Regions:
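Hydrophobic packing residues within well-ordered alpha-helices of enzyme cores
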Residues: 1, 62, 81-82, 137, ...
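Class I S-adenosyl-L-methionine
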Residues: 1-75, 174
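Short, charged, surface-exposed secondary-structure boundary motifs
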Residues: 1-3, 19-26, 80-82, 109-110, ...
Length: 225
């Protein structure tokens, strides 16, 4: 935004869970309207426009209107947000797969997905936009057989100066959410990769946190032995 000339018009069209936001159809129509006036329009999104970002809907509207466009990929919060929290999305000692899901569908209701299949098939689950239905999601995961002591983390305002990370478990997270007043925007991760944060929280280390290498103790033994 700072690179754009000062006289460039800026229109806010962001979305925040649980707060008044522009309707998606109005955003798409506004982009088309401006483009038809001969304007060069930049639709700036957080994360990646094609990962739960509704970029596909807006691009489809442009196609229908016969307006050419380009897509510049970004770093989705399920990857970048966890990296800023010191939590790797994958690690060969913990998981060979990961599942990204959204906490609600197009109607705003909890996602009608097969939680049992996801729980059985994915060691790590990353949930976008989960806070509105977090109680239901936690219950779905527990009913699907995920253990109550499974590590879980909430990354709030990821990569921002006011970023906070709450480590918890599937069994205690609802109490911890209330205690710590966790609110959106938050990215939620469930799985053993959360435990790796004590050795990989690079941002915390910059502020004096002592990191503990518990990832490859056998490698450390070979190096020092």
């Amino acid at each position: 935004m700072d690179l754009a000339p000062k006289q460039t018009p800026r229109e806010f069209a962001g979305k925040r869970g649980g707060k008044p936001s522009y309707k998606q159809v109005d955003i798409s129509l506004r982009i088309v309207q401006l483009a038809r006036k001969g304007k060069r329009v930049l639709r700036l999104k957080g994360g990646d426009p094609f990962v739960f970002g509704r970029g596909g809907e807006e691009a489809a509207a442009l196609v229908s209107a016969g307006i050419p466009f380009r897509i510049i990929p970004g770093i989705t919060s399920g990857i970048g947000g966890l990296a800023y929290a010191g939590i790797p999305l994958t690690h060969r000692d913990t998981n060979q797969s990961v599942t990204l899901v959204t906490g609600h569908d197009a109607t705003g209701n909890v996602s009608q997905i097969d939680w049992k299949a996801i729980s059985d098939g994915s060691p790590v689950i990353v949930i976008y936009m989960a806070m509105k239905h977090i109680e239901r999601i936690v219950q779905e995961l527990r009913d699907a057989g995920r253990p109550t002591n499974e590590p879980m983390a909430f990354v709030c305002n990821a990569s921002m100066p006011n970023q906070t990370v709450m480590e918890t478990t599937l069994g205690t997270c609802l109490e911890d959410i209330k205690k710590n007043q966790i609110k959106p925007p938050s990215i939620v991760v469930v799985g053993e990769v959360v435990n790796l944060r004590q050795g990989l929280d690079w941002l915390g280390a910059e502020n004096g946190k002592l990191l503990i290498n518990n990832i490859h103790p056998q490698i450390m033994e070979k190096q020092t032995g």
